[in-house]
Each structure stands twice: as structure tokens, then as C-alpha cells.
Amino acid sequence: MLCRRFLPPSASRHIAALVCGAGVSWPDVRLAPRRVLVGSSISIALVPHLGEGDQAVLFATRFGEEPEVVNWLETAAPHHYDIVLEIGANNGFFSVFLDALIRSMPSAKLRSVVSFEPSLEAFQRLLANLAANDAVHVSPFRAAVGTAAGFQAFFMPRGHLANGSLLRSFAAQCADEIDEQTVAVIDAASLEYFFTGIDRALLKIDAEGYEPQILQSLDPLIERHRPDIVIEVLAATAQAIEDFAARAGYRRFLLTPAGPQTRERVSADRDFRDWLLCAARTGEV
């Protein structure tokens, strides 16, 4: 509590490194949710886990996860979109943030968030974070989105909860030991349900190397509904995502702390991974 309320950020980070840094091992301890500020000052609660990214909420009252994405979502999502579909929601950080945004803006256009996460452990954390926030605008589903509906192997690099993937080759880059789960997979046809009566939708895709396959699966849906897309771009996926953007006629913007930056092509960036792909239409980004 001292770290969170009274110490400067540099001192809090130093204490966090001493308590939870590399080489420090803790037993699995259930901790209570901590309330933190994100974006301009949106308050959310997150359940911390020692040794993982969300442990930061133990040591500070502000949580700085992917600020370039948070800032853009806070500015654009409530006013431009009816629904956000989050594919690869992990522990639900963005889902609870979007829910808090909706509740803070009763007149917002955005009214619904749909979250997909295949990993059992990550999905349990997503549910815990939704409960900690009394979230009412989020519909969570334990499922992956892929090229065909059915069941598929999902690969979890041990000790790297955020890097689970439908691609074993991707998971193997993160850890030597890989745990395998069988998960439900839905395809684009299943997502049509969420577009009924929708004027404008946003897809947020973070699938640890599987993004090109998801875009391929969603191609007919994207052609019909023209959603905007926030997507993680890595060196191995950049060309396939650029090919999609060119074929679909989408504008490309790299999300940065200074806002979306127009780019001619999608490419892997040294500092920022998330891109905004916008359907050709008039209006603000």
C-alpha cells in the first residue's frame, strides 16, 4: 500500500523488481483485486498475479499496459462503434476497460463488448476481472476464432500465459516447455450473429502469430460489414496483414502514444506492435 500511494513511480518499480523480479519465485497466492487508473483516469480493478504483467497493480495506482492502444480506444471506441469484438482477450484487461468506458459515458454509441479467449487459465482470469469490476457490457466466450469451426490444439508456453497460440511454432519461441489444451474454435459464420443491427464494429485481434489465419477466416464477414480492426503485427505476420489491407482497401495507421500515425504499408515496428486498419469511409480515425 505504501508503494501504491506515497512512493514515486521509480521507487515503486525498484521495490517491484526486488519482490517479483527475475529469479524470485513465489508460491501460487490468491490476491485480492486492486483498483488502478488507466488512460485519462478510468478506474478499473485487476486481480494481480505474482511474476506476471498484472502484478504491477500491487505497486502502483496507475497501470500502463499498452498505453497507445488504451488512449486510442478511449478516444474513439465509445463514439464510433456499436460493438467491439475482442479476439484473444487473455485476462480481460481491455474488456474491463471498455466496460468502464461505456459506464462512464451513458450517451456513448458503444454498448457491447464480446470477448473470446481459448486458454482455460486466461479465461478464468478474465472472468475474475469481469466479476471484480461488476462488468455488465461484456459477453465472454471460452473459444478461439479460426479457419474452421470445431476443436483444435492450443499451445501454452509454460510461464507465459499471454503467449498461448494455435501455432505450436509460436509458443515454442517463448518457452521450452509447452502445455497443450484442446479448445473450441468458431469460424466467421458464427460471428455473423453479433453484426445483426450493427452500424459500425471494431475487431481487436491479438492471437500470437495467428492473426493472418483469422483475417483469412473473417474475409467474407469483413467484406460484408467493413469493421475497423486493431491488430497486433509482428515481423512474421506483417506481410500477410499488409496483403490483406491492400486487398481489402483498408487504410493503415500505426498506434503510438502520439496517436494513430498514417503509414503506406503495414510493417513490423521496433517500438509498437498494434495497428489500426480502417475501412475506407469519411470521418475521424
Map each language-model feature to its residues:
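Short internal beta-strands
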Residues: 114-117, 227-233
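Short, surface-exposed amphipathic charged segments that create phosphate/polyanion-binding patches used
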Residues: 152-159, 265-273
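Conserved S-adenosyl-L-methionine
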Residues: 141-143, 250-259
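Hydrophobic pocket-lining residues within nucleotide cofactor-binding pockets
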Residues: 89, 118, 145-147, 188, ...
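Short internal loop-to-helix segment that lines adenine-nucleotide cofactor pockets
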Residues: 60-85, 153, 167-225, 236-240, ...
